[in-house]
């Protein structure tokens, strides 16, 4: 199970045992006893003893053990037997370990547990049996471990649970049954678990949930039912879980959610229904979920949004609707979501967004509409979204950006318009975006930029214009961008840059001019930290001497190549990005790198 769903307690426990005490015997030779204050260590294990609190941990992990080691001290508090070849545990094998609080048996070959295998472990709090071969567990197996707080049974082969299997475990907080083969659960499967906080049933074969299944779990906070075979969620199935805060239903086969399916979940904060087959949402799908903060509905088959679907979700902060089949956003589609901060609608089939569709979303900070085919956006469509700071419109078939499209977005920081097939942006289209920091116009079909396109964008730091069809840039086009830090105009058709184009960009540090048709360039401003020049037909005559001198004096700013940083164990052969300044003329130096030309070549200059 991932740490997002209940693993935090386990992680903290593991750290505490690993860090036990000031005296560690793990580095001693096998069989070497501890110092005088500590008990002897089994020959095949290593031990860690903390004499301040009189706690002993015995580590017998990954020793190819086929039976339990002899001589485990009776006062052991933590015993690690994971990653061995134990196929069975004899009855009463731990009868002399009454102080044991932590037992790790995961990653072994256990096919079953004898009914009395855990006899004597009345103080055991954490039991890990994950990644074994367990097919069934007899009633009474856990009768000798009344203090259990965490029980890990994930990644076994359990196909059924007996009624009353967990009876008597009133102290259990965390039960992980994920990644087994459970297809049906009896009504009384969890009887006796009145104190349970987290229940993981992910990765099984459950196709049906009956309301009686969760009766008696009034303290449950987190329920993970992801990656099963559920086809529908019926009414009242969770009605007896008043304290549930997180419910994971993602990656099932859910096609229908009944009205009232989530009734009673007054404490619910997180609901994940993503990666299912939900085709529609009714107005009474989410009533009563007044505390819900996160709702994930991405990767379904939702074709439309009914009015008032979300009207009860007054405190919702994140709504994910990406990768559905929504074709239109009508006026007030999100009424009631006044606290929403993140809205994703990417990769739907949106062709039309009505003016007023986003009315009421006064707190939205991030909106993703990418991967649709909007073709055009009405003027004022984003009005009222004054707190929006990131707007994603990549791959949205926009074609043109008209004046007032972004009216009202006074707080916008990042605007992503990549891969839209844009052939034009009208001069006043970006006016009013005084707080904009990043503008991405990559991979469009722009042939020119209006003179005053960037008027009022005095805070812009990142401007990305690569992979367009720009043949020229007006001399005053970048004048307002006095805070520009990063400028990318690579992969265009630029033949020359006006001498004054970069004059006002005193803070520019990154400039990418690769793959254009430039023949000459005077490096400016002086503070450049990275300048990319590869892929241009450079005329290495006198006008280029200043560039040659700059490149030689600043090799880190104009590197000949950059090697990609490789991380992890699966590193491929090094990848190099080259930054050649290859001369196309005069003929006598064609094919040479500008930096390799000597002073004699420029003597006539």
Curated annotation (Swiss-Prot):
Residues 32-74 form the LRRNT domain. Pfam families: LRR_8, LRRNT. One of its GO terms (molecular function) is insulin-like growth factor binding. One of its GO terms (biological process) is cell adhesion. It is found in: Secreted, Extracellular space. LRR repeats lie at residues 75-96, 99-120, 123-144, 147-168, 171-192, 195-216, 219-240, 243-264, 267-288, 291-312, 315-336, 339-360, 363-384, 387-408, 411-432, 435-456, 459-480, 483-504, 507-528. Glycans are attached at residues 64, 85, 96, 368, 515, 580. Its main location: secreted. Keywords: Cell adhesion, Disulfide bond, Glycoprotein, Leucine-rich repeat, Repeat, Secreted, Signal. The keyword Signal applies. Residues 1-27 form the signal peptide. Disulfide bonds join 41-47, 45-60, 540-583, 542-605, 566-571. The keyword Transferase does not apply. InterPro entries: Cys-rich_flank_reg_C (IPR000483), Dev_Immune_Receptor (IPR050328), Leu-rich_rpt (IPR001611), Leu-rich_rpt_typical-subtyp (IPR003591), LRR_dom_sf (IPR032675), LRRNT (IPR000372). Residues 536-605 form the LRRCT domain. One of its GO terms (cellular component) is extracellular matrix. Forms a ternary complex with IGF1 and IGFBP3. Involved in protein-protein interactions that result in protein complexes, receptor-ligand binding or cell adhesion. This is Insulin-like growth factor-binding protein complex acid labile subunit. The lineage of its organism: Eukaryota, Metazoa, Chordata, Craniata, Vertebrata.
């Amino acid at each position: 199970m991932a740490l997002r769903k209940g693993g935090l307690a386990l992680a903290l426990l593991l750290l505490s045992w690993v860090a036990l005490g000031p005296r560690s015997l793990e580095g001693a030779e096998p069989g070497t006893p501890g110092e005088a204050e500590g008990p002897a260590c089994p020959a095949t294990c290593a031990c860690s003893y903390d004499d301040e609190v009189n706690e002993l941990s015995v580590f017998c992990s990954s020793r190819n053990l086929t039976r339990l080691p002899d001589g485990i001290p009776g006062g052991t508090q933590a015993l690690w037997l994971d990653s061995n070849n134990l196929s069975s545990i004899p009855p009463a094998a731990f009868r002399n370990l009454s102080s044991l609080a932590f037992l790790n048996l995961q990653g072994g070959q256990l096919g079953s547990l004898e009914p009395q295998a855990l006899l004597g472990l009345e103080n055991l709090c954490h039991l890990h049996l994950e990644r074994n071969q367990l097919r069934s567990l007899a009633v009474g197996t856990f009768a000798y471990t009344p203090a259990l707080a965490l029980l890990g049974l994930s990644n076994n082969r359990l196909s059924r649970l007996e009624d009353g299997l967990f009876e008597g475990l009133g102290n259990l907080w965390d039960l992980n049954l994920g990644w087994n083969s459970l297809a049906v659960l009896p009504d009384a499967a969890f009887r006796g678990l009145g104190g349970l906080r987290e229940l993981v049933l992910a990765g099984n074969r459950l196709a049906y949930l009956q309301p009686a299944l969760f009766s008696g779990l009034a303290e449950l906070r987190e329920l993970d039912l992801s990656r099963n075979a559920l086809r529908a969620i019926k009414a009242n199935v969770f009605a007896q879980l008043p304290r549930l805060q997180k419910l994971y239903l993602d990656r099932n086969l859910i096609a229908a959610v009944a009205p009232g399916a989530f009734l009673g979940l007054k404490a619910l904060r997180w609901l994940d229904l993503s990666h299912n087959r939900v085709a529609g949402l009714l107005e009474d799908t989410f009533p009563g979920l007044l505390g819900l903060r996160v709702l994930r509905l991405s990767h379904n088959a939702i074709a439309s949004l009914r009015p008032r679907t979300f009207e009860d979700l007054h405190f919702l902060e994140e709504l994910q609707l990406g990768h559905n089949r929504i074709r239109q956003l009508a006026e007030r589609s999100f009424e009631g979501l006044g606290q929403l901060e993140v809205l994703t609608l990417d990769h739907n089939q949106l062709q039309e967004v009505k003016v007023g569709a986003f009315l009421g979303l006064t707190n939205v900070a991030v909106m993703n509409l990418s991967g649709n085919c909007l073709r055009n956006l009405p003027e004022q469509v984003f009005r009222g979204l004054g707190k929006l700071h990131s707007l994603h419109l990549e791959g949205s078939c926009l074609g043109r950006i008209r004046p007032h499209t972004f009216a009202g977005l006074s707080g916008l920081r990042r605007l992503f318009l990549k891969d839209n097939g844009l052939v034009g942006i009208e001069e006043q289209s970006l006016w009013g975006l005084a707080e904009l920091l990043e503008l991405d116009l990559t991979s469009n079909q722009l042939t020119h930029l209006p003179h005053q396109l960037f008027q009022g964008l005095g805070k812009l730091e990142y401007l990305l214009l690569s992979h367009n069809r720009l043949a020229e840039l007006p001399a005053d086009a970048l004048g307002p961008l006095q805070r520009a830090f990063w400028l990318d105009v690579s992969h265009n058709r630029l033949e020359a840059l006006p001498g004054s184009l970069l004059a006002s960009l005193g803070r520019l540090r990154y400039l990418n001019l690769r793959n254009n048709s430039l023949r000459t360039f005077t490096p400016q401003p002086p503070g450049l930290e990275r300048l990319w020049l590869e892929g241009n037909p450079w005329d290495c005559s006198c006008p280029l001497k200043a560039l040659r001198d700059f490149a030689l004096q600043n090799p880190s700013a104009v590197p000949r190549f950059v090697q990609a940083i490789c991380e992890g164990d699966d590193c491929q052969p090094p990848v190099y990005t080259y930054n050649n300044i290859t001369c196309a003329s005069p003929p006598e130096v064609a094919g040479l790198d500008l930096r390799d030309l000597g002073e004699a070549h420029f003597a006539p200059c």
